Amino acid sequence: GPEYTTAENSQPSGGFIACPQSMRAFTTADVSSTTVPAWVESYLSGLNAEGATYHDIGMIWGARMASKRGIMAANVNDQPYRSASRHLIFMTDGALQPNRYAAGNYGIEIFANRIAPQYTNDLDLIPYHSARFRAACDAAKNEDLVVWMVAFGTAITDDMRYCATGDRVYFASDTTQLRAQFRTIASQIASLRLGQ
């Protein structure tokens, strides 16, 4: 398979150079409906589990996309005269699973040393990424985002409970339950919208 090489090391990459599904810019959704929009169904169907799950980078990008001050501000603030609640739905299909040999947003962890000290093992990387995840969750909530957590086929963790706004934490063991949970979330957002 492919390899990566540095002056000090060469390592077969195996499945550690995954290209995740690209983010999707905000799209207008019918908040009066309890059905999951077709574009969400299609997007979710295209997701593939590759391992090396990083909750922190997912939350960082979710918050960046929804921030009124962030790189997507023009999209977020396109109708400033409307008082819209903003919701971030964070779904994961795996427990936090950093891998020091995985190519990620900040390079290959064992060589880049941007998250933890060099040669930190996979298990010892978890507290670093957990702390970053919680900090990203705090930042998202400080941006007045309502954070919903969905655990798909994986256990709900203390980090997920910490991150969610209130008790907005959901579990789904299969796609039928996942669709049901998204319908529940959609109906609650619609109720919030109608009540404001």
Provide a role label for each language-model segment.
Residues G1-Q196:
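P/S/T/G-enriched low-complexity
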